[in-house]
């Protein structure tokens, strides 16, 4: 099986969030599984700064059509393998499996998608170029992939291109496509005049094409044309079929529901491993869970809060934004603090909520610690030292923080939505609540405190949480099964098996 992954980002080469983690982890797992996999990425400034010595110019001449113009770019190539210690080995090679699409006007910028002032105004041009460049390179190099797996709106035009502008290309004759929607809230919506950039005319501006309330929607093109659509949890796959979660595309998704699959994300068990974590005060695992208390001591000292080892510490790590439920956390905190609970925050977000968290820290300096920013070492210390983690999201396609928390025996308290429903078992590995309100969150925290005060039951819950396997090894196998099913279906239809 020959597989291509096409994404706007992948760790460690480029990353702004969960998309980069997912694609980077899948690439690594597929290499380990012996899959013939190639990854296509833009050659961003941050990639050039960190990996310029690991790539070689492929010396391929190609032109990517953008509207009436053809723009030319370069390709940088590297060979990626995984050593016995699970580390990526990245070496320059023209026969590599990592292709970087280079175009300085589009990708040589400080940020991937935009600045604090907003998205880059030419994002449509940038990712049309990237998508067309990938396909043009495949043509020139005669790269015959069995499956091209696209990720999010940035590459969602590729399935549409393969069924239209590139349908006569022999190298794509047998290619199947998968499109993963990591978060339906991001769709690549642009003004109507951007349509011509895609290579399509007004014939594509209709309800079953790219038209979306008078605008152009890149993701919609992929949803209609990918052979399989995946999203990042089974529950989220069901939720997005409804108007409440479908972000205007629920009708399209209902038409494709027979081809829609939810696969839970994983976490990197090498990075997130309390038995080997270099950032935490005391390493621990299932065999020495009590050593987790040493990390609680360390966290109390670091945060400068007035809390004993017997007092519960509840953490929040992530974006301080409306979608993540920070508003109901802020509303619930004063009464909870009065009951002896301490809170630890790490993250950034909307200035209003950052200000609210700082206000709470100033009002309750002995019970609230907030780090407005992100520090990797601190995140590890919080996961290891806190007793519980809040994930009260309005919606959550999958969520990674609750998976990391369980890995560290830190009990998640989550709203029952999306991947949180699929990964946290109420009263077994964590606590779930349904209603989106500060009172429902407070009640869930009260249920947690009840178990927390029963040390035997609390220890049992920690053990159950730490036993769960959310490694990428598990998740990647489901994707491989999906690809093989697509290839088998193709071969049955063509009579080759």
Swiss-Prot record:
Pathway: Glycan biosynthesis; glycogen biosynthesis. It comes from the Bacteria. ADP-alpha-D-glucose binds at residue 15. Its EC number is 2.4.1.21. GO terms for biological process: glycogen biosynthetic process. InterPro entries: Glyco_trans_1, GS/SS, Starch_synth_cat_dom. Pfam families: Glyco_transf_5, Glycos_transf_1. Gene3D superfamilies: Glycogen Phosphorylase B. It catalyses: [(1->4)-alpha-D-glucosyl](n) + ADP-alpha-D-glucose = [(1->4)-alpha-D-glucosyl](n+1) + ADP + H(+). One of its GO terms (molecular function) is alpha-1,4-glucan glucosyltransferase (ADP-glucose donor) activity. CDD domains: GT5_Glycogen_synthase_DULL1-like. Keywords: Glycogen biosynthesis, Glycosyltransferase, Transferase. Synthesizes alpha-1,4-glucan chains using ADP-glucose. Belongs to the glycosyltransferase 1 family. Bacterial/plant glycogen synthase subfamily. This is Glycogen synthase. The gene is glgA.
């Amino acid at each position: 099986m020959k597989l291509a992954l096409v994404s706007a980002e992948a760790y460690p080469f480029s990353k702004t969030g969960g998309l980069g983690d997912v694609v980077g982890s899948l690439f690594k797992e597929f290499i380990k599984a012996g899959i013939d996999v190639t990854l296509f990425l833009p050659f961003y400034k941050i990639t050039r700064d960190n990996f310029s010595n690991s790539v070689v110019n492929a010396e391929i001449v190609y032109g990517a059509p953008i509207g009436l113009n053809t723009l030319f770019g370069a390709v940088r190539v590297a060979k990626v393998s995984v050593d016995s210690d699970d580390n990526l080995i990245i070496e320059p090679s023209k026969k590599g499996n990592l292709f970087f699409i280079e175009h300085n006007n589009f990708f040589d910028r400080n940020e991937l998608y935009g600045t604090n002032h907003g998205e880059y105004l030419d994002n449509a041009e940038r990712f049309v170029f990237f998508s067309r460049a990938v396909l043009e390179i495949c043509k020139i190099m005669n790269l015959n992939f069995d499956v091209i797996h696209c990720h999010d709106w940035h590459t969602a035009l590729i399935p549409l291109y393969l069924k239209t502008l590139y349908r006569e290309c022999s190298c794509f004759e047998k290619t199947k496509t998968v499109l993963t929607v990591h978060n339906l809230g991001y769709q690549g919506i642009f003004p109507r005049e951007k349509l011509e950039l895609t290579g399509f005319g007004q014939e594509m501006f209709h309800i079953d094409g790219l038209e979306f309330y008078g605008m152009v929607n890149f993701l919609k093109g992929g949803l209609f044309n990918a052979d399989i659509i995946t999203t990042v949890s089974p529950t989220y796959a069901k939720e997005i079929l409804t108007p409440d979660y479908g972000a205007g595309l629920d009708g399209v998704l209902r038409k494709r529901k027979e081809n829609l699959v939810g696969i839970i994300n994983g976490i990197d068990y090498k990075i997130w491993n309390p038995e080997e974590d270099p950032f935490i005060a005391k390493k621990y695992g299932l065999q020495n869970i009590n050593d987790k208390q040493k990390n609680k001591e360390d966290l109390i000292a670091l945060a400068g809060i007035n809390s004993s080892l017997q007092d519960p510490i509840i953490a929040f790590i992530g974006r301080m934004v409306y979608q993540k439920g920070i508003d109901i956390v802020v509303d619930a905190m004063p009464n909870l603090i009065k009951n002896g609970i301490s809170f630890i925050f790490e993250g950034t977000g909307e200035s209003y909520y950052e200000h609210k968290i700082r206000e709470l820290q100033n009002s309750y300096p002995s019970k609230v610690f907030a780090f407005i920013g992100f520090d990797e070492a601190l995140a590890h210390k919080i996961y290891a030292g806190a007793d519980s983690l809040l994930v009260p999201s309005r919606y959550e396609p999958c969520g990674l923080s609750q998976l990391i928390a369980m890995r560290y025996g830190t009990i998640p308290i989550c709203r029952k939505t999306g991947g949180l429903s699929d990964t946290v078992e109420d009263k077994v590995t964590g606590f779930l609540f349904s209603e989106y309100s500060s009172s429902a969150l407070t009640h869930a925290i009260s249920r947690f405190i009840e178990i927390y005060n029963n040390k035997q039951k609390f220890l049992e819950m920690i053990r159950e949480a730490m036993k769960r396997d959310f490694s990428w090894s598990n998740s990647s196998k489901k994707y491989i099964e999906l690809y093989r099913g697509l290839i088998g279906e193709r071969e049955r239809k063509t009579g080759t098996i």
